[in-house]
């Protein structure tokens, strides 16, 4: 039996519509599958680390990874709790994220542990001693593992030189830090060794939580002429309490990060945290675009800043040498 031409045409059109619809659905499904999941884990909220995160997100956008379009960021904060950092990292692995950006040493260590035996790439930032923290074996070559990142070895010796230059009656320096943070311990050991080699005495005041920072500061009153705090997440998260004790007793505070200087510390030679985040994003983008994380060599942070807070110094009667002011990259009035 011959099918009338009109019926044949209708049947052909129907087949085309069904086929086209199927292809459209398949194309839509493929597009959805291209949305990458990136876990972002930050150990604690404070301005310096928030700048790391902001720099990362801004640079990821410049690299072509737009949140909600081709990538979805799952941003988590462990609120200074190592156990929560581990839980967050484990959840990222369970969610089968495509990559993890870890901000700070504790978060990076948790991510490294959680991703063992997987191929999930981890990029770390805001880590002072990546080798000492057990994240990588060498700074000079690609890791050959799923982990790489930006290490920001603090210029501790230069920071101590700055303390010596700015505090004329310096004899003893107080060091406040969390002994549970590997990066802090590394920097404190360097500071202690350098200060003692120059003939100065060191008074340590370790803490286990941010609640102990004020008491640690109080314990140094009358015993030191200056206090130094490295890039320590625990101590910096309680900066206001620390500053109150030191300012009331006319003791200058020197820190390892620039954001703390903006908040009331006297001075630092610190890392540019925003640029650190951007640098980490560029590394992660390379991995997402096809490079293996184990073939991406760890990088040292690119930018450092000498920052002085004139108002903070004036409040405690500390006169800043003209030689220091003249070479400052940024002065807070």
Label each region the model flagged:
Residues 12-16:
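Hydrophobic helical h-region of N-terminal Sec-dependent signal peptides
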Residues 18-22:
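C-terminal motif of bacterial Sec signal peptides marking the signal peptidase cleavage site
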Residues 2-11, 23-333:
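Short hydrophobic alpha-helices and adjacent helix-cap/hinge residues
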């Amino acid at each position: 039996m011959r099918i009338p031409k009109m019926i044949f045409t209708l049947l052909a059109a129907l087949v085309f519509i069904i086929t086209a619809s199927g292809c459209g659905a398949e194309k839509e499904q493929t597009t959805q599958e291209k949305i990458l999941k990136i876990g972002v884990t930050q150990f604690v909220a404070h301005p310096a680390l928030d700048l790391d995160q902001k720099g990362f997100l801004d640079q990821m956008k410049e690299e072509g990874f737009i949140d909600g379009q081709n990538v979805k960021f799952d941003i988590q904060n462990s609120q200074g709790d190592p156990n929560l950092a581990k839980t967050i990292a484990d959840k990222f692995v369970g969610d089968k994220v495509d990559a993890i950006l870890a901000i700070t040493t504790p978060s990076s260590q948790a991510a490294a542990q959680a991703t063992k035996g997987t191929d999930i790439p981890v990029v770390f930032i805001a880590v002072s001693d990546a080798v000492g923290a057990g994240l990588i074996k060498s700074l000079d070559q690609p890791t050959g593992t799923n982990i790489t990142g930006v290490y920001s070895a603090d210029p501790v010796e230069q920071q101590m030189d700055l303390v010596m230059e700015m505090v004329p009656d310096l004899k003893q320096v107080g060091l406040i830090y969390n002994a549970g943070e590997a990066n802090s311990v590394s920097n404190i050991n360097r500071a202690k060794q350098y200060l003692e080699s120059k003939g100065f005495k060191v008074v340590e005041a370790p803490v286990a939580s941010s609640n102990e920072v004020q008491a640690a500061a109080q314990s140094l009153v009358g015993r030191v002429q200056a206090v130094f705090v490295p890039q320590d997440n625990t101590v910096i998260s309680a900066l206001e309490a620390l500053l109150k004790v030191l300012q009331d007793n006319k003791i200058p505070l020197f820190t390892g990060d620039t954001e703390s200087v903006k908040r009331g510390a006297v001075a630092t030679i610190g890392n540019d945290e925003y640029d650190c985040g951007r640098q980490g994003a560029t590394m992660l983008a390379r991995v997402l675009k096809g490079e293996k994380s184990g073939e991406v060599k760890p990088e040292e942070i690119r930018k450092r800043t000498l920052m002085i807070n004139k108002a903070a110094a004036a409040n405690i009667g500390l006169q800043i040498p003209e030689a220091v002011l003249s070479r400052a990259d940024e002065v807070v009035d």
